[in-house]
């Protein structure tokens, strides 16, 4: 008998059995691989998740640093602006006693005496020109009466009964106050009106 003629007990040639078994193995392999997860695929998935997480952290860090830099830039601009705006504060503080002295000299000057007229005019012009100069740089005088007491620019030193001025308003200014670009350099010392009673 030739090998082709040899049959297995079931009546199949050995090549047919091998082919059938090979097909069965191929048919079984996809099912087995579907159930088994390759550890390399699992590791790749873990690494991809870690990479995504690291990228997100890095992106958040970059955004945080950008925001901090923008805030720092803004704060620096404000600081420089304030420094420019209030650089004169010390200088103006040094000028205030001179302005006060000129004010006091005008208050006590004998304006009725004709011999003092030239001196009084000189003091008035000096004071006016000095106030004009400091106004150019943002200095304002706080000396109004009959205005509401503002604790930001007024320092109340006494309360006096008054019929002419509403209660809580400035009755008299004892010492002028000054502001530089809206910031109080020296509060005005004032007396405040209170209702008669």
From Swiss-Prot:
SS bond list: none
Superkingdom field: Bacteria
GO molecular function, one term: adenyl-nucleotide exchange factor activity
Region of interest (Disordered), residue spans: 1-41
Compartment(s) where it occurs, according to its Swiss-Prot or TrEMBL record: Cytoplasm
GO biological process, one term: protein folding
Listed PROSITE patterns: GRPE (PS01071)
Keyword field: Chaperone, Cytoplasm, Stress response
A GO CC annotation given for this chain: cytosol
Subunit-structure text: Homodimer.
Protein task: Participates actively in the response to hyperosmotic and heat shock by preventing the aggregation of stress-denatured proteins, in association with DnaK and GrpE. It is the nucleotide exchange factor for DnaK and may function as a thermosensor. Unfolded proteins bind initially to DnaJ; upon interaction with the DnaJ-bound protein, DnaK hydrolyzes its bound ATP, resulting in the formation of a stable complex. GrpE releases ADP from DnaK; ATP binding to DnaK triggers the release of the substrate protein, thus completing the reaction cycle.
NCBIfam families for the chain: PRK10325.1, PRK14140.1, PRK14150.1
Family listed: Belongs to the GrpE family.
Protein name: Protein GrpE
Annotated organism of origin: Enterobacter sp. (strain 638)
């Amino acid at each position: 008998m030739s090998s082709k003629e040899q049959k297995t007990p079931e009546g199949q040639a050995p090549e047919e059995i091998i082919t059938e078994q090979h097909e069965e193995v191929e048919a079984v392999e996809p099912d087995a691989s579907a159930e088994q997860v390759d550890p390399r695929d699992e590791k790749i998935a873990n690494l991809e998740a870690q990479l995504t997480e690291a990228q997100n952290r890095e992106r958040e860090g970059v955004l945080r640093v950008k925001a901090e830099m923008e805030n720092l830039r803004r704060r620096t601009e404000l600081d420089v602006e304030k420094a420019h705006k209030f650089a004169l504060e010390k200088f103006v503080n040094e000028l205030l006693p001179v302005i006060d002295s000129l004010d006091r000299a005008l208050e006590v000057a004998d304006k009725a005496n004709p011999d003092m007229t030239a001196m009084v005019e000189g003091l008035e012009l000096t004071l006016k020109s000095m106030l004009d100069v400091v106004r150019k740089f943002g200095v304002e005088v706080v000396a109004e009466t009959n205005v509401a007491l503002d604790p930001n620019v007024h320092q109340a030193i006494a309360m006096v009964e008054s019929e002419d001025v509403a209660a809580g308003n400035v009755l008299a200014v004892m010492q002028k106050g000054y502001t530089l670009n809206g910031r109080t350099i020296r509060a005005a010392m004032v007396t405040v009106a209170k209702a008669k009673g």
